[in-house]
């Protein structure tokens, strides 16, 4: 199983195997749309696909992102900004809470992604619960956010009862 350390991050095939050359081709955005797993040891790990866009930069679709280490506050944003700097394209997020097992954690994750979208760190989110896209207005985002927060309050109350 080949892996490449590129820009301080270790990249390898998420499913199947790729040669060293194939991995570099995919990272440059010229390969097929394959899902890669990545890890910056001690900082973050995840899974994403990379595509060359018409402007010559590479867009990233993130399927999973996990911050590593005991102090994680602010590191998700930092990881996303690092990936954005490396690939210089847009970042889309697809089904980010799929691997989480409890609903409260999923809601927390969705709130994080809403905030990252609002700040312009990510350019879109497509999940079972929320869909954020360019052109969505702040009023609609606030409504989505309030729905998530309300659900979290209910879950917190149910857990404490």
List PLM regions with ranges.
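Non-catalytic substrate-recognition and accessory regions of acyl/acetyltransferase enzymes
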Residues: 1-71, 81-161
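Residues forming the Rossmann-fold NAD(P)(H) cofactor-binding site
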Residues: 77
């Amino acid at each position: 199983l080949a892996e490449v350390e590129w820009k301080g991050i270790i990249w390898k095939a998420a499913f199947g195997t790729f040669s060293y050359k194939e991995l570099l081709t995919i990272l440059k955005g010229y390969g097929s749309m394959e899902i890669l797993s990545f890890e910056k040891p001690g900082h973050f790990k995840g899974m994403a696909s990379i595509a060359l866009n018409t402007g010559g930069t590479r867009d990233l679709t993130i399927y999973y992102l996990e911050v590593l280490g005991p102090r994680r506050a602010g590191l998700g944003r930092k990881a996303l900004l690092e990936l954005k700097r490396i690939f210089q394209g847009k970042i889309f997020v697809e089904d980010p809470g799929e691997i989480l097992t409890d609903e409260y954690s999923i809601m927390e994750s969705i709130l994080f992604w809403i905030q990252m979208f609002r700040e312009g760190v990510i350019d879109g989110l497509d999940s079972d619960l929320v869909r954020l896209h360019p052109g969505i207005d702040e009023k609609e985002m606030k409504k989505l956010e309030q729905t998530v927060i309300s659900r979290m309050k209910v879950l917190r109350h149910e857990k404490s009862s």
